[in-house]
Amino acid sequence: MPYKENKLRQLGKSSISATDIASQFWCEKQMELNYLYGKKYTEQMRKGRQIHETLQAETFIPLTVEPVTYADYMYKVGYEDYMALKTLDEKGVCRELQIYGSLNGYRIVGKIDELRKEKESTRIIELKTIEANARIAAFDEAKMKLHTVQIMLYKRLLDSIKNREYTLYNFAKSYGIESLKLSDTFLRGLHTIGIKEEFANIGEIYRMVFDAISALPPISEKLELRYIDRFSGKQASSIIINYSEEKINSQLKFALGYWNGDREALPVSEEEKWKCKLCKFYGKECKVWWNGD
């Protein structure tokens, strides 16, 4: 356990995100350096976030009351999850669903871009923004690998909640939900917008979230990666991925080796050192493949 605690503490983290794990399959060293030195919020990221927010607003209006404390924040996430799941039931689609889980004792958190109800199943869709007119084969293939890891992990986490392997009890114990109390300021805000007293309760809101996920139709083995043109906001392409339990288990075993402290963060291989010129740490904090150019 000390290795686990030290690695998370070193990066200033209390949990591992699905994005962290996926990023290990682009460049594990870059993922680590982003936490050690700070991740730059780029214009591309801003546009991507804008697209996600626009799509979310098409299904429901996020909670407008701003959180003051950690408890308030957790309630806001739970409330928006519940509203997203309600739209899945009513409209057949939900967006921006935050989910939780556990792997080898680590807290795992991820945000599913979209769920869609099909005839007898629920499909997971991951949205990624791209520059449609500036595509390079090697770049696309490398990005596809990490996107595939991410969406397979989402299915694993969602299945775990649906099948009651990761329960409300597990979640509440891990995040200390029972001891959390909403701030008076936040509660007043909830009452102002008409949220009833019985729903202004953090334990109750997550009970409804976990019950709603458990009631979902089976999660489809067909996972969809949908690529959106960053500038127009229109769909550029769509790829169906077949879920593989064997493959995701192997990938998670590799990824957790880093978090367990079994090895240091790995740089890219020589075959993929072209990625380095896309990295802000190249030639500065990381000189693995730097030749002084």
How would you describe each model-predicted region?
Residues 15, 141-145, 270:
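Short, solvent-exposed segments of well-ordered alpha helices
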